[in-house]
Amino acid sequence: MQIAKVRGTVVSTQKDPSLRGVKLLLLQLVDEEGNLLQKYEVAADNSVGAGFDEWVLISRGSAARQLLGNEQRPVDAAVVAIIDTIHVEDRLIYSKKDQYR
């Protein structure tokens, strides 16, 4: 799994029929220290409802397809959780509550 920040949405009017109704998000990956990386990825969000600027947890591969309920969907990554806090040892790396203060 990987931590990422939602940077936007991806809209496509022409797509594989199995992706109809699936929200696609543009994510910026985050390292273990909470730093934004210069790497982006598109992930499906079929159940979590993540929004702009939220930090999320993504799963890849067959686990992502299982989450979406259709292992035949052409999906490499899926959002599995919206992150509330991240602690590393005794340090708070991220807090959703403090994000907009």
UniProtKB/Swiss-Prot annotation:
One of its GO terms (biological process) is photosynthesis. One of its GO terms (molecular function) is structural constituent of carboxysome shell. Residues 1-84 form the BMV domain. It is found in: Carboxysome. PROSITE patterns: BMV. Disulfide bonds: none annotated. Transmembrane segments: none annotated. It comes from the Bacteria. Keywords: Bacterial microcompartment, Carbon dioxide fixation, Carboxysome, Photosynthesis. One of its GO terms (cellular component) is carboxysome. Gene3D superfamilies: EutN/Ccml (2.40.50.220). The tight homopentamer forms a pore with an opening of about 5 Angstroms in diameter which opens into a wider tunnel at the base of the truncated pyramid. The pore is positively charged. HAMAP family: CcmL. Homopentamer. Interacts with full-length CcmM. Probably forms vertices in the carboxysome, a polyhedral inclusion where RuBisCO (ribulose bisphosphate carboxylase, rbcL-rbcS) is sequestered. Has been modeled to induce curvature upon insertion into an otherwise flat hexagonal molecular layer of CcmK subunits. Belongs to the CcmL/EutN family. CcmL subfamily. This is Carboxysome shell vertex protein CcmL. It comes from Nostoc sp. (strain PCC 7120 / SAG 25.82 / UTEX 2576).
